[in-house]
Amino acid sequence: MKPIDFLAIGDVVVDAFIRLHQASVHCNINNSNCEICMPFAEKIPYEFVEEIAGVGNGPNAAVSAARLGLRSAMMTNVGSDENANKCISAFKKDGISTKHITRHKGFKTNYHYVLWYEDERTILVKHEAFKYKFVPPWRNPKWVYITSLGA
């Protein structure tokens, strides 16, 4: 087995991009501190929803490294749900090793709702309270990318 060139360590999520059809943006006088506003207690139409599995800072870096031709691996923690399977499948499709992924029975994989309006996005986040465990590589990788965990 060849050593890993690039190891990414960080949380993985499934993003559900919700393309909003109707909303408004209100900013202060300096055009900063903007807020997205929608009717309260109403049914709000949206254009579409698209789920993307296996994303986040670490996964995005691992995919980039793999596409550059490096032997890439992801070290992360996931739940025991279907979203974990989707993330692992996405990694394998991109040629990323999944040998360093820890599954937690009874937990869900991190899932974010991304409210996408015009050219901006607002992300609703919920991170699972994993008791993080990591499977170290049997050889030191050439490069390690460490990013957010549980944040």
Label each PLM-derived region with a short phrase.
Residues 2-4, 9, 69-71, 96, ...:
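Short coil/turn connectors at secondary-structure junctions
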Residues 99-104, 112-151:
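Conserved phosphate-binding/catalytic loop of the ribokinase/pfkB sugar-kinase fold
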Residues 21-24, 88-90, 128-129:
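Short, glycine/charged-enriched secondary-structure capping and boundary segments
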Residues 90-107:
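A glycine-rich helix N-cap at a beta->alpha junction
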Residues 25-26, 90-93, 117-120:
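Short, hinge-like loop/turn segments at secondary-structure boundaries
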Residues 1-75:
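Glycine-rich phosphate/adenosyl-contacting loop at the front of the ribokinase-like
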Residues 77-79:
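Alpha-helical transmembrane segments within multi-pass membrane transporters and channels
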